[in-house]
Amino acid sequence: MQPQDLDLNYGLLEDILKAFLQNEIRKFGFSSVVLGLSGGIDSAVVAELAVRALGPEHVLALKMPYKESSRESLEHADLMIRRLNIKAEERPVTPMADDFFRDVPEGERLRRGNIMARTRMVLLYDVSARDGSLVAGTSNKTELLLGYGTMFGDMASAVNPLGDLYKTQVRGLARHLGIPSILIDKAPSADLWEGQSDESDLGFSYGEVDLLLYMMLELRMEREAILGEGVSASFYDRVRKMVVRNQYKRLMPVIAKISGRTPGIDFRYARDWQEVR
């Protein structure tokens, strides 16, 4: 397996994702979106797609830095705001996050990171309610499969155009869309603390894990066949465990089924019956 095996027809993909945003937002009865613009590639791609699908007047970018956030990240977010000519607001999370952090030891970075992600989502959904817009998500397929995200934090959204794209494919789409290379080529980071990077947290690169996930999920290859492709047993076992262990993050809260028509189980598609008016 080679990285190019994950390549897609990115022109067709762009059309599909623009139609997805237009149709889903219309079905919900809305016309605009708000998203957190971090300065990273995922949020840049979602912002670009939203503008092409809805128009710049229907897209609001929220910058939500913490006091230790990378200055480079803010500059890259501003670069996309200027490129797309979209409205933007800066809402620092420092005061709210620091209130929580008083009770969280500095060494407990996972807890602090989850608090930061959920604080940002509180701001996004408050702006969504204020403006009557929908929150557009930016989590990609790799993150969702590995559980590399915060429930009701960065994983929360109303619509997510990237959820079925591996990180490698997001990069390919970004190049097709003309996203500045400085955003595409930099080390991915959730900007949760100074010097944080996704790949150092995970212990492997997106390129490596995307190929493994593709063989596991899309090709449905057995363990021995994947090991025959040169994947180490320890890497395979670790990634499989992450995918299985984090299944709960990919589901809405599990409901105890009592009746014959249970929300999310038997009764799922009400909003598709007709347009909301």
Swiss-Prot record:
EC number annotated for this UniProt entry: 6.3.1.5
Broad class of enzyme this protein falls into: ligase
UniProt: deamido-NAD(+) binding residues: 118
UniProt-annotated binding residues for ATP: 36-43, 138, 167, 189
Assembly and interaction partners: Homodimer.
Pfam families: NAD_synthase (PF02540)
Function: Catalyzes the ATP-dependent amidation of deamido-NAD to form NAD. Uses ammonia as a nitrogen source.
Sequence similarity: Belongs to the NAD synthetase family.
Record-linked HAMAP family: NadE_ammonia_dep
Keyword ATP-binding: yes
Pathway linked to the protein: Cofactor biosynthesis; NAD(+) biosynthesis; NAD(+) from deamido-NAD(+) (ammonia route): step 1/1
Reaction equation(s) it catalyzes: deamido-NAD(+) + NH4(+) + ATP = AMP + diphosphate + NAD(+) + H(+)
Residues that, per the record, bind Mg(2+): 42, 143
Example GO BP: NAD biosynthetic process
Keywords in alphabetical order: ATP-binding, Ligase, Magnesium, Metal-binding, NAD, Nucleotide-binding
GO CC annotations on file: cytoplasm
Organism, as annotated: Chlorobium luteolum (strain DSM 273 / BCRC 81028 / 2530) (Pelodictyon luteolum)
Single annotated GO MF: NAD+ synthase activity
Record Gene3D superfamilies: HUPs (3.40.50.620)
Protein name: NH(3)-dependent NAD(+) synthetase
